[in-house]
UniProtKB/Swiss-Prot annotation:
Family listed: Belongs to the RNA methyltransferase RlmH family.
GO molecular function terms listed in the Swiss-Prot or TrEMBL record: rRNA (pseudouridine-N3-)-methyltransferase activity
Record EC number: 2.1.1.177
Enzyme type, top EC level: transferase
Compartments reported by the entry: Cytoplasm
Catalytic activity: pseudouridine(1915) in 23S rRNA + S-adenosyl-L-methionine = N(3)-methylpseudouridine(1915) in 23S rRNA + S-adenosyl-L-homocysteine + H(+)
Domain of life according to the entry: Bacteria
Name this polypeptide is given: Ribosomal RNA large subunit methyltransferase H
A GO CC annotation given for this chain: cytoplasm
Source organism per UniProt: Xylella fastidiosa (strain Temecula1 / ATCC 700964)
Keywords: Cytoplasm, Methyltransferase, rRNA processing, S-adenosyl-L-methionine, Transferase
Length: 158
């Protein structure tokens, strides 16, 4: 059976993000079991080195990956998808028979190593979003894609 992971850099999300994530995670679990793996972020202080933080977090992400994953990296330079396109991608990903992994980076983004192993890059658009909020948006969009594929009334379309 395909394993689906959401690997997100960051811990201690605001309560409202955790509650929203839990709700959509519960709804999605009937169609696609998803496991959240939280990666410890690098320390950010007065002498913060952004590149070092990206590399440290990247190593932790790489260590959390299952064998031979199909990695979809959330990246501002990725391909933007509308809800129907995401549903089509979900159908494709499910048919691959590989472990599916969604990767959410920290405040500075992903290491080059993480970007290099990505099979696809998905952009939520040109907006700058708090990385903690992205996990909620992703799980809601995955749920929406599932409802499109199952003709559930949650997604009313155009």
């Amino acid at each position: 059976m395909m394993k689906c992971l959401l690997i997100a850099t960051g811990q201690h999300v605001p309560t409202w993000v955790a509650q929203g994530f839990a709700e959509y995670h519960r709804r999605l679990s009937y169609w696609l079991p998803l496991e959240l793996v939280e990666i410890e972020p690098s320390m950010r202080g007065k002498n913060h080195d952004p590149q070092r933080a990206i590399e440290d977090e990247g190593r932790r992400v790489m260590a959390a990956l299952p064998k031979q994953p199909y990695a979809v990296t959330l990246d501002v330079k990725g391909k933007p998808l509308n809800s129907e396109q995401l549903a089509q991608r979900m159908e494709h990903w499910r048919g691959l028979g590989r472990n599916l992994v969604f990767l959410i980076g920290g405040p500075e983004g992903h290491s080059q190593e993480v970007l290099n192993i990505s099979n696809e890059r998905w952009s939520l658009g040109p907006l700058t979003l708090p990385h903690m909020l992205v996990r909620l948006i992703v799980v809601e969009q995955l749920y929406r894609a599932a409802t499109i594929l199952t003709n559930h009334p949650y997604h009313r379309g155009k």
